[in-house]
C-alpha cells in the first residue's frame, strides 16, 4: 500500500466523478500537490448509479459552454490517456409539442451554434427519417444533436483519475476519513487510517454524505433538489438517444 504523506496543499474527499474531476482540474491549473481520499473504491458511492447521459445543449449559454467543454474533454482524454470512457455519441433528439416549447428549442439551438455545437433544427418529416417509429401527433418540430450520447460513469471517473495521476495527484482508496481537523476556525487536516494529513484546503465531494460531514463541522451544505419529469399542459419534451 502506498504511504500516505503527512501534508499536502489540498485534500479531496470522495472518489466519485465529482471528486476525480475536481482533482484533475486542480492539477491541470497548477495545484498538483493534491490528495484524493476514497473510503472504498473509486465510483463505489452514487457515481456508478448514474445514467451517463452526455448532452451539450443547456438551458443557458453558461451551461451549454460547460457541457461542450466536458464532451470535448472526455474525447481528448480518451486519446491522450488511451483509456475508454465508454463514449457512445450516437446523437440525441428533443421534440416539442407546443409553440412555447418549440420556440425554446429554437432559442437553445441558436445558443448552441454560438459555441460551435453542431445542432440541426428539424421539421416533423425530418424527425421521422431519424426516428421512424415516433408518434408524430402534436409534434411541431425538434432539434437533433449528433454529438450527444452516453458514457460509462465508471469509465469516465477512472479516466479522470488516471489523467489526474499523470499530473501528479495522489489517490488513495480504502482510506476513509476518520476525522476532519479544525484549527482557529479553519480546516487544518484530516485523520486517515490513524494518521494525520495536514492540508490548507479541503474539498468535500462526498455526494449524499456531504450533509452528514458538514454537520460534524458545523457547516451547512447545499441542499438537493429532486426533479420529477412528467407531462404538463404547457409542454411535453421527448429526449431520445439513438442507436446506430
Question: What are the functions of these language-model segments?
Answer:
Residues 225-233, 244:
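Conserved small/polar residues in nucleotide/adenosyl-binding loops
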Residues 26:
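Aromatic pocket-lining residues of Rossmann-like dinucleotide-binding sites
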Residues 196-228:
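Central helical "cap/lid" subdomain
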Residues 5-16:
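Beta1/beta-strand and adjacent pyrophosphate-binding region of the FAD-binding site
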Residues 19:
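N-terminal Rossmann-fold NAD(P) dinucleotide-binding loop
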Residues 29-46:
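Glycine-rich FAD pyrophosphate-binding loop
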Residues 147-196, 200:
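Helical element adjacent to the flavin cofactor pocket in flavoenzyme catalytic cores
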Residues 51-130:
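Dinucleotide-binding Rossmann-like beta1-alpha1 core, especially the glycine-rich loop
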Amino acid at each position: 500500500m502506498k504511504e500516505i504523506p503527512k501534508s499536502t496543499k489540498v485534500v479531496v474527499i470522495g472518489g466519485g466523478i465529482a471528486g476525480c474531476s475536481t482533482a484533475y482540474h486542480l492539477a491541470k491549473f497548477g495545484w498538483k500537490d493534491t490528495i484524493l481520499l476514497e473510503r472504498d473504491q473509486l465510483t463505489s458511492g452514487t457515481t456508478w448509479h448514474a445514467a451517463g447521459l452526455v448532452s451539450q445543449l443547456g438551458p443557458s449559454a453558461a451551461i451549454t459552454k460547460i457541457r461542450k467543454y466536458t464532451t470535448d474533454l472526455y474525447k481528448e482524454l480518451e486519446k491522450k490517456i488511451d483509456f475508454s470512457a465508454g463514449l457512445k455519441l450516437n446523437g440525441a433528439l428533443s421534440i416539442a409539442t407546443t409553440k412555447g416549447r418549440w420556440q425554446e428549442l429554437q432559442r437553445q439551438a441558436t445558443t448552441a451554434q454560438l459555441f460551435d455545437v453542431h445542432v440541426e433544427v428539424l421539421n416533423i418529416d425530418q424527425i421521422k427519417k431519424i426516428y421512424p417509429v415516433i408518434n408524430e401527433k402534436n409534434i411541431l418540430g425538434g432539434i437533433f444533436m449528433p454529438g450527444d450520447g452516453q458514457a460509462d460513469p465508471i469509465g469516465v471517473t477512472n479516466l479522470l483519475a488516471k489523467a489526474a495521476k499523470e499530473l501528479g495527484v495522489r489517490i488513495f482508496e480504502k482510506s476513509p476519513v476518520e476525522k476532519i481537523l479544525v484549527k482557529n476556525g479553519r480546516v487544518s487536516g484530516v485523520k486517515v487510517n490513524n494518521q494525520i494529513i495536514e492540508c490548507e484546503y479541503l474539498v468535500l465531494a462526498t455526494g449524499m454524505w456531504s450533509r452528514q460531514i458538514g454537520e460534524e463541522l458545523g457547516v451547512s451544505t447545499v441542499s438537493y433538489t429532486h426533479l420529477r419529469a412528467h407531462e404538463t399542459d404547457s409542454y411535453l419534451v421527448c429526449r431520445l438517444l439513438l442507436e446506430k
